[in-house]
């Protein structure tokens, strides 16, 4: 289980030549994501999704609040957490001059996967993500979708318990997107915990057990897709999203 407790992140930006202004990109967010569950993090650009996920992944320090992974927290168990965690964003950069196979071997060694298990693990992941045809090709020659599959493979190599995926299918072709979505569903069936942000409402509706909608750094609605549709009297998550975002903006 991932438990997020009152996370806040404050930034300072220049208002004009003389004045600076403080603002909260994430303002007191709390939620839980359970084993065997995909929880979608939804919101417009600038809502605070990426900042939130970077704090949950331990890449960015919060101004206040904390995150628990079962009985672990970053203050006491940072190394243990990061060994059991996978984080991926849509714009993650990887080495262009080596092959996916070489990259996966390097990542496996970094995560201390047993040497006699590395090749079998790489072949298993290659099969799951349909990478066989380009496993030994130069990464710099791969398509965007193929490169993102390599990124997913890099996250999968150490068999993590927790996944934090930030717009993992953004800009991908339909085949690559579906492979990644199928992968997430299979990891959920294994009891893994998945946090997943996306701009694609249809995708979220099909794959997420629960969704958390964020605007201006605050949670504005949380529930199953069916619960949110019912609460907003809409027939799909896209319409529910616009109803909630519009209502939240009108209250300001």
Predicted regions mapped to residue ranges:
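Conserved ABC ATPase "signature" region
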Residues: 105, 109, 116-134
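Conserved ABC transporter NBD signature motif
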Residues: 65-76, 80-81
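Helix-to-loop junction immediately C-terminal to a conserved catalytic motif
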Residues: 57
